[in-house]
Amino acid sequence: NEINKTSESNIGIRVNPNPKIFDKKDIEYVEDGFRFGFSDDNEELERAIKIVQTKSDSVGLHLHCNSITRSKDVYISLAKYAVNVIKKYKLNISYIDMGGGFFGGVPGKTTQAEYINAIKQIFEPIVDVRKTKLYVEPGSAIIGSVVDLVTSVIDVKNTANARIVTTDGSRIHIDPLWIKKGYMYSLETQKETINNRQIICGYT
């Protein structure tokens, strides 16, 4: 029994939130729902909680979701959902993991402090915020705002249609899902001459 091996540990449960708690403009999966975690709509979450409570007096909650807008309202809705779960099952919470998907240093967008303060205000009436740990997973929000990808040209070929410029870096390094439509970039060139059509290709 795996839970016996971890009975001395701080066990966390991944919650599968009902997508209906979010605004449709914020979440892509309103109709299909999320794939990870235990759902409170079909008693799976209740069963998971009961199993954990046989071995531990406290429990952690994981509440990740994917947002297309990175809106602060997404995390407010998620925190309110967590509060309802905590109240419903009378949970003694050791930590709460709100996942990632935050903006990172983008001018005019929600700051890290604003996210955290909004989340804190929801949890403060229900948990001891001095003892209950809050985890966030900013990931790309950290690295995306402080890292530049620097590439150089390694090959140039003239074809019938265009000049093909190959670099030693690739789009996959900064946009592995190939979703982004435009990029902030700067050029360092030896000449200011503007050639006819050029296509910049990543290294593959």
Predicted features and spans:
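Charged (often Lys/Glu-rich) extended helix/loop segments that serve as interaction or gating elements
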Residues: 118, 133-204
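Secondary-structure transition/capping motifs at alpha-helix termini
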Residues: 87-92, 126-130, 158-161
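Alpha-helix-loop-beta-strand connector modules within alpha/beta enzyme cores
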Residues: 82-86, 116-127
